[in-house]
A protein has these predicted regions:
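Conserved beta-strand segments of alpha/beta enzyme cores
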Residues: 33, 83, 175-178
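A short, glycine/Asx- and small/polar-enriched loop/turn
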Residues: 1-2, 44-51, 189-193, 203
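Active-site catalytic microenvironments for nucleophilic, acid-base chemistry
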Residues: 26, 30, 79, 226-234
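The feature captures the short pre-catalytic strand/loop hairpin that immediately precedes
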Residues: 2, 139-142, 200-204
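Flavin-dependent oxidoreductases
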Residues: 42-141, 145-154, 162-170, 250-258
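Helical element adjacent to the flavin cofactor pocket in flavoenzyme catalytic cores
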Residues: 6-64, 68, 72
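C-terminal catalytic lobe of FAD-dependent flavoproteins
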Residues: 113, 122, 152-258
């Protein structure tokens, strides 16, 4: 059944929390200020241009805003009439019980035909899916609660089971491995599964950097660099229209479409 595969020896794994703290430390070293637990209350504009933001009752004057609020980006942008075609879907994975003699250097394996991915996780195996027909999150409303940062959905093993069966067929070691954790949580996606970058057409100096389609840990550094260059120079010296938010029309962010 397996005709061949592609190995990328330069790939690796990273701790998301560690990477986040590293980037935050680097930003602070360059003079950036970071305010946690500070929800955006209002985006301020004047004459069709960004003028500031209101956070925790405090008005902060600014010339530019970069919206990088993950799955909350769409509803934040809506407050000022900006269309961001982003939708949260339910994402599933399981973590097995510990497996004896499991290699810590097991490659992260993507089985595109069966929509699964498999990787080592502290002596256990994680099996996740990126299925073609996913389940819309939050009852198809696309309204993400403000306090849902680490929230989970009820288990849906009926939806996950066919993909697990395919994974077991590909990796028989899973057949006798118990399941320690079944995770179901939201992940936001764009209609074409490409990132949303660049200045929005509705408001000048309003940039977006969101819709990373569950590959933020791998592409975050690159999209951050591109966004910074774009913001500082007003253009980018390469063709990245496939990521430019202007590739979409207003109707693309309507619930009936996404």
């Amino acid at each position: 059944e397996v005709i061949g595969g592609i190995l990328m020896p330069g790939d690796g794994a990273a701790d998301p929390s560690g990477v986040t703290h590293m980037l935050a430390k680097g930003a602070r070293m360059e003079g950036a200020q970071i305010f946690e637990k500070s929800p955006v209350e209002e985006i301020l504009t004047k004459d069709g241009k960004i003028s500031g933001v209101k956070v925790n009752g405090q008005k902060i004057d600014c010339e530019y805003i970069v919206l990088a609020s993950g799955m909350w980006s769409r509803q934040i942008a809506e407050r000022v009439g900006v269309s961001v075609p982003l939708y949260p879907a339910e994402h599933f994975y399981i973590i097995t019980e510990p497996i004896e003699n499991l290699s810590k250097t097991l490659p992260v394996i993507r089985d595109f035909d069966n929509s699964t991915y498999i990787k080592e996780d502290a002596g256990k195996i994680l099996v996740g899916i990126f299925e073609k027909k996913s389940i819309p999150a939050f009852n198809k409303t696309n309204i993400v609660p403000e306090d849902f940062s680490f929230g989970e959905f009820p288990e849906n093993f009926e939806h996950f089971e066919p993909y697990l069966a395919s994974a077991i067929k590909r990796f028989p070691v899973l057949e006798k491995a118990g399941i320690r954790k079944f995770f179901a949580g939201p992940e936001s996606f764009t209609p074409d599964t490409n990132t949303l970058l660049g200045e929005v057409p509705e408001i000048k100096n309003f940039f977006v950097c969101c819709g990373l389609n569950s590959i933020g840990i791998g592409s975050g550094g690159g999209v951050g660099k591109v966004t910074a260059e774009w913001l500082m120079t007003g253009h980018i010296n390469q063709d990245i229209f496939c990521y430019d938010i202007k590739r979409f029309q207003k109707f693309h962010s309507e619930l009936g479409f996404i």
